[in-house]
Amino acid sequence: MELPCFEPRLDADQAVDRTDRLTPTSFLLSTLRSLLGRSDDADPDVTVLYYPDYLAYTTVTLRRVGRSDKDDKFIAAVDAATGRVGEVDVTLPDVETREVADERVVPIEYDEADAEREWDEWLFSYVDRTYRPIKQPETSLDRLELVYTPYYVVDYGPDEDRYAISALTKQVELLEDIPPLADAYTAPASRA
């Protein structure tokens, strides 16, 4: 299946390197092992999974007393697997089309109508908290776009931790902390 995906900001080897640096102890141990040539640990399994998000291109028009109106544009993201919403606070890379096996894609639980509804519920409190308007501002959803973020799942084996590294933000998290990603990884077809 062809998917619109963010261009990754790191590759699989860099993702594995990031898991070695989670704590000073793990970093020192991995460095010491490699210096002494004692790296008896097997290389971890690395799997790429694709996580769906809707990008909501938003315009807010603030009505300011005694001054002209002010337009502010920003991007919000609606998690297509859980429905969570938040402002995008990173510079987004280019979107490219990739051919991806179906079993590597986290299933979408929220369609466009659901995503728009979640965005609308989130937007009022966000605008109130961010802009502190005196008058109710006008808001509009300029465009809603589905895009997939590549995640590297680094699996050190059954008795060790498994990590999910975002190819967009380079953030490392335990795989179990992202339930839709963990479910997609443990599905038999994705590990084939």
Name the predicted role of every residue range.
Residues 1-152, 156, 160, 179-192:
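Charged, low-complexity helical/coil segments in non-catalytic cytosolic or luminal regions
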Residues 166-167:
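Short, acidic, Ser/Thr-enriched surface-loop or helix-capping motifs
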Residues 171-172:
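Hydrophobic "anchor" residues
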